[in-house]
Amino acid sequence: MAPSVVPQSAAGGAALQASADDQLTIEMLGAGQEVGRSCCVLKYRGKTIVCDTGVHPAFTGIAALPFIDELDWSTVDAILITHFHLDHAAALTYIMEKTNFRDGHGKVYMTHPTKAVYRFLMSDFVRISNAGNDDNLFDENEMLASWRQIEAVDFHQDVSIAGGLRFTSYHAGHVLGACMFLIEIAGLRILYTGDFSREEDRHLVQAEIPPVKPDVLICESTYGTQTHEPRLDKEHRFTSQIHHIIKRGGRVLLPVFVLGRAQELLLLLDEYWAAHPELHSVPIYYASALAKKCISVYQTYIHTMNDHIRTRFNRRDNPFVFKHISNLRSLEKFEDRGPCVMMASPGFMQSGVSRELLERWAPDKRNGLIVSGYSVEGTMARNILNEPDEIIGINGQKIPRRMSVDYISFSAHVDFAQNSRFIDEIKAQHIVLVHGEQNNMSKLRAALQARFTARGSDVKIHTPRNCEPLVLQFRAQRTAKAIGTIAAKPPAQGDIVDGLLISKDFAYTILDPKDLTDFTGLSTSTIVQRQRVALAVSWEMVRWHLQGMYGRLQEGVDAEEGLRTLRIMGAVDVRQSARHELLVEWVSSIANDMVADSIVALLLGIDSAPSSVKMTMHNHHHHHHHHHHHHPGDAKAEETDDDAEATTEDEEARTPTESAANLPMHPFSEAALVAESEVRAKAATDEAVHRDAYQLAKMEHMAAFLEAHFGQVEELVIPEAPISEEIEESVPKVKVETEREAEKDEAGDESMSTLQPEPDSVTDVDKPELAPPAEQATASPPISIASLFDGEARSALRVFLDEAEAVIDVENLVILASSESFRARVQHLCTLALRSFTSLSDAFYLPQQMGTSLFQGKHSQLATIPEFGEERPSKMVRSS
């Protein structure tokens, strides 16, 4: 799919230059040039997908939600949650239960580990956020109700949603169950990473590279251009700092979230304590009411972790059964005496156990705080990194800070090196940076742009703000896949493929109508239309008018009912169903309906047509009837007479008898044209030409047509020419067609007798075959007929226009011209002349119907009409 950027207007909007169907709209309802309340809305081809629905950790209540009023949630087709962190998932319950999302048909998807952890994490979130807060977003029951509606998916599972929307989840590292989503809408691929890590740690795999190239990459920019410390170095610094604080008799506070980096640090501390017996007397506490439940979830999804963890588990060594770590459900059971290590949630220390312990331990200089993850601006974790002398307690009191503060990042977010390498491997044409503060995002954009410019790559990088839609234009390349009978023989270059085009979920398939049921399960139907017309004229009069309008007719008798029938243009049947009634029948289609309408209009005007009145006028004889008295046998006799009359009418409708009145030929019928041509041919002086009356009439018509355009036309008689090499390439094409059509006419339809149709196009050869190359450079050399042709005489026309001239062999439809441009012009006019000369039945071919209401035929085409028996099963037998 070829992308292009829609230029932005001065007001920040998009100057739309193409159809809205081909535009991808990306709107951030959160995490646009900020960290927190991640919520990305994608709109393309009538589909709406929302990626993540988090809250902002620096705010509470409604203020923490994304800008949800900017979207009609009933139109959302799917909500995809990348992982269970609050800034990516905590607003989900509010959206599902308190917006019009429930009025739509959208569903929510996340991985199995994410759904399992999400329930426990959200229970803790509800408990903490609702404690002493009147601005509650939702309660426990609403959270559980929404949780039951979430659909869990596996990694690498291809999930299809009706309407051409599908997605696949890939490992993202970061935390247990975290994934990135590769979304495909009508062929457009979008990779939304969420939070991801390209470094394999003690228990998680690194983020995957999807096997297919996306058109758009939406990725995080949390750390901008910063570079992480090597893992072994920061692990050593982390354990050394903890050891140092313990040696000085202090307590270590590690603010973490219940799940995520906490498990990585627990594995590290348990391993370090095992290697240092002198620390066995110092307890490590994991302060969380959900700790035990969360650890059970980790043990359940061991198979999603890295090889190191799976290998230990296969040796019956469960890495999450810690030997030196104790769970602490609440501070009420905590004896705050002596050195210890306390891991407490939440990580931003806005409330909860971590905030309470911070306020309690901050005044003691022996204690130490180690911030191990990313801190959002506006939170206590971010503020205390500035090492203020005082901190503000939850109740507003000022608390002196004397404890040490260290920042050792174990954040499972990519740094610049990992992110830039990942972007290079993805190779997307558009990169959208999200989930990053404005300063970090701007630095990352500049650094990436410099890299792409140095390589000469035309990659577009975007940094949208919240509620400012980004519009990208994509030129969709629509292709249709041929299946079934059509695909049995691959077409050559330039061939026209004729079939049904099926569109489903933005995918196109072309197939033969006969294969429709097999490949789609759709049933087919044919609409046969019948129209009865009351008409008080003879059958011969009807035929006379139809011949004058449509030319050649196919006449016979209906095989089922024995009714004499006329078939017009191979598509519409006119039957004499009764003495004064006609039945018009046809298979419904756009072209056939048009022909049937014209036939019905013609039939309705026959009664009052002046030609009909003139031909049916005759002397009137008035008879006097003698009246007799009725006697009992008269009624029976009259009844017998009525039956006899009805029988006679029925026989007249069924028996193709000749008319008593000898109607003259219609002046515009094919028979009249041939007759007139024969008269003219007999009067012709050239004995070699007059024997073909039809060719003579065609030549006269073409001469008049050309004379009206060029003014100077000569009639010639030329002998048959010896065919040169290049003329031989074109003339046989006409001869082959004519012979094929002649074979059709000789074989015929068993139910019909038809006339030989005339070709409707001309075959041309160029002037370069008429003269040596040196003469071609001169303007309009004369054409020598004697030097070109010899043999039997036949009709020809010579056309002049200034210095240019051309000779037209009327019989073989070959054009010889002094220049290519003049030859093309004459060819076009000759084609028009032939079409105007040929009757409607011969000039227009109505193709066979597809036999399905899904495809009502096609428009008529200018072509030679084929034999009826090859196009549609006939019910007619030859008329005697």
Curated annotation (Swiss-Prot):
**Positions contributing to Zn(2+) 2 binding:** 87-88, 195, 435
**Subcellular location(s) of the protein:** Nucleus
Q: State if RNA-binding is listed as a keyword.
A: no
Q: Where is this region: Disordered?
A: 618-666, 729-783
Q: What is this protein called?
A: Endoribonuclease YSH1
A Pfam family this chain is assigned to: RMMBL
GO BP terms: namely: mRNA 3'-end processing by stem-loop binding and cleavage
Its cellular-component GO annotations read: mRNA cleavage and polyadenylation specificity factor complex
